[in-house]
């Protein structure tokens, strides 16, 4: 107060006012501060001061020929005095108004194309709906978010090359446009920008907005996709939020969302196959999302989600060094630990072997709906500060932290046996066993944890075992905070390794991710996901498996045919037949396979018995490990449409219908493709039918007269021998069997003989 009086007193003296207003500022430090460097030190003051002058703008000399010296009101638009230190003209702000009203009109056709991101934003806002404003405490946490809707996902370097190629095509400098997306964008933009008059620099700047993902680390309470982030300032303050529904979607958000769904489906599917890593890679390489190859998206898209990161790790890409447990992302912020195997007893006296982390560590835990700070010692939780959207979310975080702490009271709280399995029916590791157990029911865990009196700390309250808040008591070491915990800000990526069971480890051997961490949430993808891999056929149910399997055989018939005759085992082991096995009743799979393989062997042995349709029809059944049995089948069962349906070994059925005239195959009424048949197949079927019941003795033997035709064979008596002409023009000696034995024994004996006979 005294100081203010003193200043008032000074100002009342006219001399003071004169000194302050008239004296030049010549203090070196001040001059230095305001004149060194190109950076404006006080932009708003500078702007106000400039605009108060008569001619604050400078322009190229040509402007004097394009703008009159005075406007209609007689106000001067530009000064005849040149700008000091340059040969530009000093111009009044009124000149801008004149130009906007009377200046030349140019074509506006390029504006929506160049300023595409702005035009689209206006559309989204126009069609968006703003709801009521709610006043409540906002739990915001800083997350890395995409602030630039509607962009492609090129890297900065790739975008730079595209921009140079589009905007300055004639500039020198090595530019190699390699990726599909680069070439596509370049072609499209060059066409759009023909005869464009907008300044190249502006075009370059706008192109950058369109091609590169820009992320910022911002405090967010609600949706994190870019169409929400662009209105962040309108939808959430410190103590209020406004409901908002975007008036449109942008491809980059759709790509992120669809990528997560595709990755989850692929990881879940790979986890149950014989070789998860090989299957995962095969699926990533053969999948397209919205017409773009998934592997290209993975290389460019920075989305961090468990399944996406497993796919990236499999491709040898770097991923974030944080690890995942129970759906929370853990990042160690201080401390260190060594791992040691230890055997512990559950409350049910079951022995578990757990890897204990010894040492003091601090972590941040970030989940979708809750965040926390965790401090722990060896098998002891020291402190957990949680914040979350609701009671349920807070409870989830507490369970995960309690299990992660490996405390004895948590292990002793287990009631009953732990025998959770993953999708491939393998037992989960002990930590995930415990997690699943308590996620199902945490009552005993919370009751046994112990409670303590708490001090009154600003912004923090206690939480009781029944999840009710309290200011007096709380579960031991656990507090609920009003403030969220920020996501880990660094975008640092580390080299990781992945084993065949899709467990991802950092270079120290710590497990960062495993298929158990992949969310089971199902969603509907915004962009079309095309899985070309046979492993994903079953995603649309059994019918799709059936149709796809037969389509695949028909598409690849030429190679399949050769393998069928030369290397059947390799053919039976093909990945493409794996999904089909789930349709065949488990109990009889082996017998079917044995039967079909023997039938095929017989076709190979008895010349001329090659029957394309039958091979195609029965081939998928031969893929299961065969059981030797004497069983013969006239039809094979597959489980589709909720019941067993029959495929006839000889002849058509609703499941497998081959039309000889049109050569079209329909499976369950769906078109499965056209067969290009072998020319000599017409008669082959007849011959094979007759040759059954005959024993092949060897090469042609002239003593038994001229070769008979197939039809004449039927006149032979049992035990009688004759030469016979078979399909491929070979003549062999046969004997009519003395007794009617099974087709199968027929072919087994014929095997060696026919080869000898022909060769």
Curated annotation (Swiss-Prot):
A motif (Nuclear localization signal) lies at residues 736-739. InterPro entries: Flu_PB2_2nd, Flu_PB2_6th, Flu_PB2_C, Flu_PB2_CAP-bd, Flu_PB2_middle, Flu_PB2_N, INV_PB2, PB2_helical. Keywords: Cap snatching, Eukaryotic host gene expression shutoff by virus, Eukaryotic host transcription shutoff by virus, Host gene expression shutoff by virus, Host mitochondrion, Host nucleus, Host-virus interaction, Inhibition of host innate immune response by virus, Inhibition of host MAVS by virus, Inhibition of host RLR pathway by virus, Inhibition of host RNA polymerase II by virus, mRNA capping, mRNA processing, Viral immunoevasion, Viral transcription, Virion. It is found in: Virion; Host nucleus; Host mitochondrion. Coiled coil: none annotated. The keyword Repeat does not apply. One of its GO terms (cellular component) is host cell nucleus. The keyword Nucleotide-binding does not apply. Plays an essential role in transcription initiation and cap-stealing mechanism, in which cellular capped pre-mRNAs are used to generate primers for viral transcription. Recognizes and binds the 7-methylguanosine-containing cap of the target pre-RNA which is subsequently cleaved after 10-13 nucleotides by the viral protein PA. Plays a role in the initiation of the viral genome replication and modulates the activity of the ribonucleoprotein (RNP) complex. Belongs to the influenza viruses PB2 family. Influenza RNA polymerase is composed of three subunits: PB1, PB2 and PA. Interacts (via N-terminus) with PB1 (via C-terminus). Interacts with nucleoprotein NP (via N-terminus). Interacts (via N-terminus) with host MAVS (via N-terminus); this interaction inhibits host innate immune response. This is Polymerase basic protein 2. It comes from Influenza A virus (strain A/Malaysia:Malaya/302/1954 H1N1). The lineage of its organism: Viruses, Riboviria, Orthornavirae, Negarnaviricota, Polyploviricotina. The gene is PB2.
């Amino acid at each position: 107060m005294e100081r203010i009086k003193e200043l008032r007193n000074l100002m009342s003296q006219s001399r003071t006012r004169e000194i302050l207003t008239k004296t030049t500022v010549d203090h070196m430090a001040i001059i230095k501060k305001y004149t060194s460097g190109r950076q404006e030190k006080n932009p708003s003051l500078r702007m106000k001061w400039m605009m108060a002058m008569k001619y604050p703008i400078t322009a190229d000399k040509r402007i004097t020929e394009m703008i009159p010296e005075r406007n209609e009101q007689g106000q001067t638009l530009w000064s005849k005095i040149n700008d000091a230190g340059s040969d530009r003209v000093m111009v009044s702000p009124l000149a801008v108004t004149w130009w906007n009203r009377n200046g030349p009109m140019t074509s506006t056709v390029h504006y929506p194309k160049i300023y595409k991101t702005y035009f689209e934003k206006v559309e989204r806002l126009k069609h968006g709906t703003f709801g009521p404003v709610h006043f409540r405490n906002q739990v915001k946490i800083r997350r890395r978010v995409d602030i630039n809707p509607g962009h492609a996902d090129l890297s900065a370097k790739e975008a730079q090359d595209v921009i140079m190629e589009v905007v300055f095509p004639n500039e020198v400098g090595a530019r190699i446009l390699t990726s599909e997306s680069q070439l596509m964008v370049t072609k499209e933009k060059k066409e759009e920008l023909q005869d464009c008059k907008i300044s190249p620099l502006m075009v370059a700047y706008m192109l950058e907005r369109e091609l590169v993902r820009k992320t910022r680390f911002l405090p967010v309470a609600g949706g994190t996709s870019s169409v929400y982030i662009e209105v962040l300032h309108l939808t959430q303050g410190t103590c209020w939020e406004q409901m908002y529904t975007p008036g449109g979607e942008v491809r980059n958000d759709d790509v992120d969302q669809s990528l997560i769904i595709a990755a989850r489906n692929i990881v879940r599917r790979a986890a149950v196959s014989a070789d998860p890593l090989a299957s995962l890679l095969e699926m990533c390489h053969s999948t397209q999302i919205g017409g773009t190859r998934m592997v290209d998206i993975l290389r460019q898209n920075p989305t961090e989600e468990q399944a996406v990161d497993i796919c990236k790790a499999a491709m040898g890409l770097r991923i974030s060094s944080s690890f995942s447990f129970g759906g929370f992302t853990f990042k160690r912020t201080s401390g260190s630990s060594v791992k040691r195997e230890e055997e512990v007893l559950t409350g049910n006296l079951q022995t578990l072997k757990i890897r204990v982390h010894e040492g003091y560590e601090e972590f941040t835990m970030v989940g979708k709906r809750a965040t926390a700070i965790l401090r722990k010692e060896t098998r002891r939780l020291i402190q957990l500060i949680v914040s979350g959207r609701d009671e349920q979310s807070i409870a989830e975080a507490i369970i995960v932290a309690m299990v992660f702490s490996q405390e004895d009271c948590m292990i002793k709280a287990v009631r009953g046996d732990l025998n959770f399995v993953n999708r491939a029916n393998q037992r989960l590791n002990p930590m995930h066993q415990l997690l699943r157990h308590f996620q199902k029911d945490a009552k005993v865990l919370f009751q046994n944890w112990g409670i303590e009196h708490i001090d009154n700390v600003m912004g923090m309250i206690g939480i009781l075992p029944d999840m009710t808040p309290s200011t007096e008591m709380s579960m031991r070491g656990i507090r609920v905070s009003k403030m969220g915990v920020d996501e880990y800000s660094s975008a640092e990526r580390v080299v990781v390794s992945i084993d065949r069971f899709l467990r991802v480890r950092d270079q120290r051997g710590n497990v960062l991710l495993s298929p158990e961490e992949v969310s089971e949430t199902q969603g509907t993808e915004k962009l079309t996901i095309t899985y070309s891999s046979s492993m994903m056929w079953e995603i649309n149910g059994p019918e799709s498996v059936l149709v796809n399997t037969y389509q695949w055989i028909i598409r690849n018939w030429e190679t399949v045919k050769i393998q069928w005759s030369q290397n059947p085992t390799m053919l039976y082991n093909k990945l493409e037949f794996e999904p089909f096995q789930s349709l065949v009743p488990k109990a009889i799979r082996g017998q079917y396979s044995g039967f079909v393989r023997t039938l095929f062997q017989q076709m190979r042995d008895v010349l001329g018995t090659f029957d394309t349709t039958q091979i195609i029809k029965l081939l998928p059944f031969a893929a299961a490990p065969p059981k030797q049995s004497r069983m013969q089948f006239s039809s094979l069962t597959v489980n589709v449409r909720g019941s067993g349906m029959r495929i006839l070994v000889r002849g058509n059925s609703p499941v497998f219908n081959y039309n000889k005239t049109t050569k079209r195959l329909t499976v369950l009424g769906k078109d499965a493709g056209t067969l290009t048949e072998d020319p000599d197949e017409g008669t082959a079927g007849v011959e094979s039918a007759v040759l059954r019941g005959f024993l092949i003795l060897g090469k042609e033997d002239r003593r038994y007269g001229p070769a008979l035709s197939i039809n004449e064979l039927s006149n032979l008596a049992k035990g009688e021998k004759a030469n016979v002409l078979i399909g491929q023009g070979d003549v062999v000696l046969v004997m009519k069997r003395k007794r009617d034995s099974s087709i199968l024994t027929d072919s087994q004996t014929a095997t060696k003989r026919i080869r000898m006979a022909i060769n």
